[in-house]
């Protein structure tokens, strides 16, 4: 089961680096450091915000508080 991560796409937590930080915390709690490192590397290589969020969603249950994206 994927850990749940909530962010606000229109607030400061919508910044992709903030989303990654929240994701890192969630995955570390489950001792999935290698998964986070892989996720981070793939996000850094992505070409858009939407692509980055799509990658992150492969690792965590990512939910926008505003119901967007």
Per-range role (PLM):
Residues 1-69:
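Long, contiguous binding/interaction regions
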């Amino acid at each position: 089961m994927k850990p749940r991560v909530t962010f606000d796409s229109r607030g400061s937590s919508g910044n992709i680096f903030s989303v990654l930080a929240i994701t890192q915390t969630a995955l570390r709690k489950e001792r999935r450091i290698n998964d986070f490192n892989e996720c981070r590397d793939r996000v850094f290589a992505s070409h858009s915000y939407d692509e980055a969020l799509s990658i992150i969603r492969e690792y965590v249950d990512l939910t926008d508080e505003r119901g967007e994206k």
